[in-house]
Amino acid sequence: MPKSILLINGPNLNLLGTREPHIYGSTTLADVEAASKAHAESLGATLESFQSNHEGAIVDRIQAARGRVDGIVINPGAYTHTSVAIRDALLGVGIPFIELHVSNVHAREPWRHHSYFSDKAAGIIVGLGVYGYRVAVEHVAVNFKELEKANL
């Protein structure tokens, strides 16, 4: 059975490609999702994408993935620094996840340096631009057995 990956993008990532392109680049979220799906399929995995600007919707989607998804790639956007609810949802479903950020959050404003997810993530990808999505998808698809053993 193919590995199943859920790609979650948080608030304002629907503006990818047009919002602050000097920081986030010019590739759109639709382009990222299509490329991520194609890459997952080339590795024998399936990928479903979800984006929301609403914390509760993200929590609901994570909970709905329980027992149906093998790994999550999440770019929580601004919720990285504020959302205990999303953190608790990820821990509650027990699905290994990769935390992803397009920009290098550690080279930006000090308040962006803290993440509610990093200490529980199976891996963290920051500052690689949208290429980070490819890296994250590949890691989940190829190294799932290692992710499965992640101490969550």
Swiss-Prot record:
Source taxon at top rank: Eukaryota
Enzyme Commission (EC) number: 4.2.1.10
Pfam families: DHquinase_II (PF01220)
One Gene Ontology molecular-function label: 3-dehydroquinate dehydratase activity
Record bears the keyword Cell inner membrane: no
Active site: 24, 101
UniProt xrefs under PROSITE patterns: DEHYDROQUINASE_II (PS01029)
Biological or metabolic pathway of the protein: Aromatic compound metabolism; 3,4-dihydroxybenzoate biosynthesis; 3,4-dihydroxybenzoate from 3-dehydroquinate: step 1/2
Alphabetical UniProt keywords: Lyase, Quinate metabolism
GO term, biological process aspect, one: quinate catabolic process
Binding site for substrate: 75, 81, 88, 102-103, 112
Reaction equations catalysed: 3-dehydroquinate = 3-dehydroshikimate + H2O
Role of this protein: Is involved in the catabolism of quinate. Allows the utilization of quinate as carbon source via the beta-ketoadipate pathway.
Family per similarity comment: Belongs to the type-II 3-dehydroquinase family.
Subunit comment: Homododecamer. Adopts a ring-like structure, composed of an arrangement of two hexameric rings stacked on top of one another.
Protein name per Swiss-Prot or TrEMBL: Catabolic 3-dehydroquinase 1
Gene name of the encoded protein: qutE1
